[in-house]
Amino acid sequence: MAFELPPLPYAHDALQPHISKETLEYHHDKHHNTYVVNLNNLVPGTEFEGKTLEEIVKSSSGGIFNNAAQVWNHTFYWNCLSPNGGGQPTGALADAINAAFGSFDKFKEEFTKTSVGTFGSGWGWLVKKADGSLALASTIGAGCPLTSGDTPLLTCDVWEHAYYIDYRNLRPKYVEAFWNLVNWAFVAEQFEGKTFKA
């Protein structure tokens, strides 16, 4: 069965002024879609045929991994954003962030540093470790926390195609704008154990 490009969970212009309609048209409709097309061209006739996207990400390498992980990462990223996002988390997630980082502001500062400081194209992540603790991670290229057994809670895409139309080379400005869109309800669902399937 072929993989399909999931629709955005909001309209292309819904994240303005922080992320433009043009960026989403390129980022989702072209870049994300290209990974889907590539994956569908690579999988037939391999051991990965018939496997879920998550299974492929956890067990593949090379071109199949790169495209599968990028499909998964992007679908997860779109869900981390919302036109009604921003603000701060509440409840158990907020408590866990405070316990791990000292305060929400300190977490925000550290996550921003992790994302901005990712060398080249990659992703900044908040993850839940197997012992339930929270940690930050930076992955290069198509890197995905699923491969290390961590549970992704939040990601910021810092590939240049995520921000270049709107912010050019100013990655810090893009990450600053990202905070206005974070979908804390989605992040909380992941923290509480809801399994995300891309």
From Swiss-Prot:
Cofactor note: Binds 1 Fe cation per subunit.
Ranges in coiled-coil conformation: none
KW Iron (keyword) present: yes
GO MF, one example: metal ion binding
Reaction(s) catalysed by this chain's protein: 2 superoxide + 2 H(+) = H2O2 + O2
EC number: 1.15.1.1
InterPro entries with a match to the protein in the record: Mn/Fe_SOD (IPR001189), Mn/Fe_SOD_BS (IPR019833), Mn/Fe_SOD_C (IPR019832), Mn/Fe_SOD_N (IPR019831), Mn/Fe_SOD_N_sf (IPR036324), SOD_C_sf (IPR036314)
Binding-site positions, Fe cation: H27, H74, D157, H161
Top-level taxon in the UniProt lineage: Bacteria
The protein's assembly and partners: Homodimer.
UniProt cofactor(s): Fe cation
Protein name: Superoxide dismutase [Fe]
